[in-house]
Amino acid sequence: MRFGKIDYLNMLPFDVFIKSYPTPCYFKQFLRLKKTYPSKLNESFLFRRIDAGFISSIAGHSFALYPYSLGIVAYKEVLSVLVVGTKNAFDKESASSNALSQALGLKGEVLIGNKALQFYYSNPKKDFIDLAALWYEKKRLPFVFGRLCYYQNKDFYKRLSLAFKHQKTKIPYYILKEAALKTNLKRQDILHYLQKIYYTLGKKEQLGLKAFYRELLFKRIQKPKRF
């Protein structure tokens, strides 16, 4: 079981959950080693260096959706995926967000993850576009930025997904403090941000995914691939 994880604040509730969830010891050992940004994790997954993980939605397009499927979802706004300025520039750490910017026909620099949050909370003028907000304005659907995908051990990941889905995770003070120091964000800002993120893929979320995949097809936006 080689599980890879996005090293962003949006995975903080999962980090807390997995610490106490019963897994083989090597699962958590590998997880600690394999933390990176989305586009790098996609590459590791497509080349089978890992066999499971929360990967970008654009890279997980061929994987089946189940009632228990998990994702990284934002409804109406996300705060951590922004387009700023007028000069086009993709974020090298991103895959789905770059594609979403293209699908929405935007011009500007894409910022994702912790650096986008730093920009959001330090920019009182709010002179940026929140991609989840614009997606909702156009589609009236949530946007799924990432998906839990796996090549094997389906029963294990089904149990894990259901457990995470039904457990309300409270983030301990010391973990919030560590995250605040690491990201240069305030604890209250982190908690505010996490209120915008959820992980269940219900009917609306699956419709949102399908709408995104249609946009990729119609606008001929390239998906990550092995070769």
Regions found by a protein language model. Give the residues of each.
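Domain-level signature for soluble enzymes in the chorismate/prephenate branch of the shikimate pathway
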Residues: 1-227
